Every structure is written in structure tokens, then in C-alpha cells.
């Protein structure tokens, strides 16, 4: 079971009051929403309280917004048989595989498998939410409440360039921060070159400070061994297994497989143009890049 930090006396007092208040609000304002316990269990209340620094009014407002969103959007009912879910799953961009040393499920997010035009921003958001729900169910089985993400940018080139990625990110980020608080343990980044750093300057304008503090840029895949056991990592990340056979065969056939893939230097001119356009569209002043950045 995941260890939670001890609460200060004043935090404990707020938490205990919320454990009384929120079930009452649930019964009075959301009587027709099923599975009240999902929204009013101590774990859920604790996550919202911690995410919003035990400020009672803020916690209640954010919690109510979550109940409203979840009971309307119904993320737990998204099916793997939906066309948009099937096609994005087949792309291989997102994939759950095992866990870190603390048994937190790991989501591999591999940009070299991003397919331009495969999904609209709304469909991309729906797929991410589907995958997150899937991972959190696994976390619960393992006695955990959080997940980790390995964001792998190696092999990303002009065929993956998608100006709408930022739009999808702007839609998705508030949903994750508001409706899945305290679910992310760490977001590991592999292959963080100059283009990533340029895009990060935009991303950080709509990502909370708390979330930004969970981003860890790794120098190489070997750094993952600090937090993962070797037997729980895929071969391309310094592990010893290819994972399930079906997925392994797909990866072997891909022209983008492996850590030896080149960087984005051959596409640098096009990527700089893309970056400038994205900055312009989002009203952010681009940094001055120097050769070798």
C-alpha cells in the first residue's frame, strides 16, 4: 500500500470535516449519481484535499466539479471497442507495461508512434482518459493510487509533426489536474532536445507548478534503473523483456523502433518553422535559439 505523508493537525482537522461534509453534499446535490462511495471514500477526499492545500472552500468546489464531470463524461465507460480508441491503441503511442519499484503502473508515451491526422484533439483527449482509467484500475489492484509516465521523444521526426498536439494538450491538462489530482508520481522525459525545450515553454503556461515539479528529464534510459527493476522494463529502456508477443511483433516491424533512431537534426528547419507557428498561434514569444541548443 502506498505510504501517505503524515498530516499536520490542522490538515487532519480539515480532512475529517470534509469526510463528513462531502458525503452530505453528495446525497443532497447528486442523489442520482451512482456509486457514491467512489466520490466520497477517504482516498478520493484525501487526494482533493492534498491537491488544493486543504483549503476547504476550494476543495469542495473542485470536488463538486469532478462529480459533475465524471457523471456526465463517464470516463469509466469508455470502451476499447470504440473506433477512435481502437485505432489509437493500434498506433502503439501509449502503452501500459508493468511498474516502477514501488509498484506504480507505468505508461509509455512514445512520440515516434504519433500519427498525423489519426485523431482530432477531442479524440486524443478521450483516448488519454481511457488509458488513464485503465492504469488507475491496475494501480488499485497493486495497492497504489499513483502512476508514472515515460515520455519518449526519440525517433520523432517530420512525419510526426502535428501542430494540433499542443491544442490536445491544452484540453487534456486541465482535465488531468482538476479531475485526477494526486495521481501522477513522476513524468520521465527521454530525448529532451531543443524542440522539446521550445514546446515546453508553451506547455508550462498551462501546467500547474505542482505538476511541473513532477517532470524529470533523463540523460539516458539507464537513469530509469534508479526507479525501475530491470526485469520490469522493456528492452529498449534498459530492461530484459519485449513484453507481450503481439506488441513485440508490432515494434519489431516498425521503422521507428529502438534507441538508435536518429535525432531531429535532419528536420531542424521544418521543426523551427513549426515551432514558430505554434508560438504565434498561442501568443507566446519564442526564445532566441542558438546553434547547438
Labelled PLM ranges:
Residues 1-293:
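Basic, amphipathic alpha-helical/coil surface patches used to engage anionic, phosphate-bearing ligands
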Amino acid at each position: 500500500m502506498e505510504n501517505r505523508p503524515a498530516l499536520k493537525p490542522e490538515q487532519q482537522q480539515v480532512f475529517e470535516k470534509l469526510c463528513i461534509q462531502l458525503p452530505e453534499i453528495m446525497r443532497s446535490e447528486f442523489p442520482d449519481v451512482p456509486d457514491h462511495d467512489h466520490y466520497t471514500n477517504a482516498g478520493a477526499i484525501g487526494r482533493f484535499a492534498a491537491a488544493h492545500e486543504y483549503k476547504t472552500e476550494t476543495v469542495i468546489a473542485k470536488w463538486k466539479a469532478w462529480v459533475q464531470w465524471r457523471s456526465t463524461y463517464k470516463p469509466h465507460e469508455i470502451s476499447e471497442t470504440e473506433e477512435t480508441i481502437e485505432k489509437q491503441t493500434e498506433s502503439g503511442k501509449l502503452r501500459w507495461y508493468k511498474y516502477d519499484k514501488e509498484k506504480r503502473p507505468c505508461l509509455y508515451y512514445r512520440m515516434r508512434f504519433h500519427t498525423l491526422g489519426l485523431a482530432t484533439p477531442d479524440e486524443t483527449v478521450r483516448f488519454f482518459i481511457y488509458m488513464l482509467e485503465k492504469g488507475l484500475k491496475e494501480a488499485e489492484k497493486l495497492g497504489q493510487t499513483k502512476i508514472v509516465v515515460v515520455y519518449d521523444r526519440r525517433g520523432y521526426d517530420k512525419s510526426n509533426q502535428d501542430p494540433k498536439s499542443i491544442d490536445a494538450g491544452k484540453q487534456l491538462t486541465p482535465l488531468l489536474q482538476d479531475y485526477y489530482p494526486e495521481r501522477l508520481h513522476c513524468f520521465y522525459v527521454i530525448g529532451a532536445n531543443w524542440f522539446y525545450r521550445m514546446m515546453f515553454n508553451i506547455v508550462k503556461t498551462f501546467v500547474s507548478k505542482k505538476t511541473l515539479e513532477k517532470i524529470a528529464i533523463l540523460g539516458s534510459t539507464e537513469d530509469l534503473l534508479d526507479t525501475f527493476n530491470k526485469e520490469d522494463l522493456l528492452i529498449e529502456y534498459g530492461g530484459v523483456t519485449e513484453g507481450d508477443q503481439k506488441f513485440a511483433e508490432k515494434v519489431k516491424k516498425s521503422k521507428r523502433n529502438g534507441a538508435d533512431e536518429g535525432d531531429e537534426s535532419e528536420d531542424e528547419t521544418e521543426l523551427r518553422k513549426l515551432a514558430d507557428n505554434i508560438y504565434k498561434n498561442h501568443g507566446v514569444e519564442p526564445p532566441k535559439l542558438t546553434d547547438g541548443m
